[in-house]
């Protein structure tokens, strides 16, 4: 199994939200083939206005524990297909497309944003 971590999950893990930390810690000790995040997620996490230098360093250290999935032509084309069929913001379309291309379960608290995307499997850390 593969997991793609959404922005809110990484932010929650950094903030120490217990259900998210428990889910990620459990996943890292399980037999997951891959745990990563989209390059769009890195932009969202680190591009936050007012981020302190200490928080940026902490977030970069957190991101370094996982693989980054690039936004390549295949991801962009899949995101275009998604946006043609579902009303969704561009970053979420890129994340969803990445999950589909990588055949990964999308781990997110924003399950509603992804519910109408065909073929995506969404996991909420609060219910794991």
Where are each of the predicted segments found?
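Generic structural signal for small/hydrophobic residues in well-ordered secondary structure
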Residues: 6-7, 45, 79, 99, ...
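Short, structured coil segments at secondary-structure junctions
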Residues: 62-64, 117-118
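Alpha-helix capping/helix-boundary segments
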Residues: 9-10, 41, 75, 94-95, ...
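Short, well-structured N-terminal submotif of metal-dependent ribonuclease cores
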Residues: 1-37, 47-61, 128
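Acidic catalytic patch
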Residues: 64-85
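Short glycine/serine/threonine/alanine-rich loop segments
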Residues: 84, 88, 104
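Acidic, PIN/NYN-like endoribonuclease modules and their adjacent C-terminal/linker elements
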Residues: 1, 96, 100-128
